[in-house]
Amino acid sequence: MPPPLHIRTYHQLTEADRSGLGEQVGAQHRRVAERLAPVHRIVAVMSGKGGVGKSFVTALLARALARAGQRVGALDADLNGPTLARLLDARGPLAVTAGGVEPVAGTDGVRCVSMAHLLEDGKPLAFKGPGSDAFIWRGALEAAALRELLGDVTWGALDVLLVDLPPGVARLHELLDLLPAPPDVLAVTIATVESADAVRRALNAARERGARLLGVIENMAGPQFPGDGGDTLSREFAIPLLARIPFNPGDAIWQTLAERL
């Protein structure tokens, strides 16, 4: 059985627990900083909207970096729709040692941690909250789960940790609140105006929080998705268009992308 996250429901918290939440969160932040100290670089991969192949890009980029000789970790921060472990063939369960939770080694040695390692196949992530306020408590528990995935995992010495963010900007803000320093940010879009609009908002949010924008990747490039979304975002934010990735790309494009990072 996979190890459970050490998260209690609202009803399981005592008054002492509730009054000490600030201290507990501070301790978790310090633990995150300690765990990530051996990690040379953190890159958050974001899209702003779903359906652009962001997790696919994250997985193939992680493998290319590993093949280039880098020590690579990959965290699936999409708690509700985790796919990164499957894309990296990182089969669980996670192993718990005296030092913490060990990542699962996937293809090309990429060290992966995903909520999929903690859930039974096909089971949704479900947090319980107090009655009509459950949606508020659910958000707090998801943030706590992200803290534990960062703070309880023995990532070890890594050249780069890729964090696969879910669509939107909420998880980006949670990540930025947790990390001791802002990460680098890589944006994935398709060429359409609609995708570029969503990614624009996400990039603005990242820039306002002090993250360094590495560039944009236009995925699924070709006649199926007309437009110039990648070029538009590159011009607006003065960041490079790192790659146009077609359907069924070969290995060479991933190696080139890894070199550009």
Regions found by a protein language model. Name each.
Residues 1-49:
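Extreme N-terminal, non-catalytic leader segments
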